[in-house]
Design a protein with these regions (language model features):
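N-terminal, polar/charged subdomain of small-to-medium soluble alpha/beta proteins
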Residues: 1-113
Length: 113
């Protein structure tokens, strides 16, 4: 899986390694479905502190479209983990929903007599 990293934060090199490792780990079972992930970090209100670290994860999936999830937290790691966990749950839900539609579509075909 290809991980693209965008950030305007000062300690971006540490965050880049962390984001790539965490994204590959969280999506390890869905790599056949998610070929590319984009992780973007932004500090909403600058160096003032508070719950303002935003992580946006955009996943391009094969056949299900793209998934974009944003999480805001007090620190970068929590924001990254929150966004990745929500994104993986959403991709899994979309995959199951798509499989259900295909199964119902096959059952809807009338039998010939």
């Amino acid at each position: 899986m290809q991980v693209i990293f965008n950030s305007r934060v000062g300690d971006a090199s540490d965050l880049r390694d962390l984001a790539a490792r965490r994204a590959r780990f969280v999506m390890r079972r869905l790599t056949w479905l998610v070929p590319r992930a984009t992780v973007q970090f932004t500090d909403v209100n600058g160096p003032r502190g508070g719950v303002d670290k935003r992580c946006q994860v955009a996943l391009r999936t094969d056949g299900l479209g793209s998934v974009v999830v944003t999480a805001v937290a007090r620190d970068w790691r929590s924001a990254l983990d929150g966004a990745l966990s929500r994104a993986s749950r959403l991709v899994l839900r979309l995959c199951r929903r798509d499989q259900g539609r295909r199964e119902r579509g096959q059952r809807a075909i009338p039998l010939e007599r």
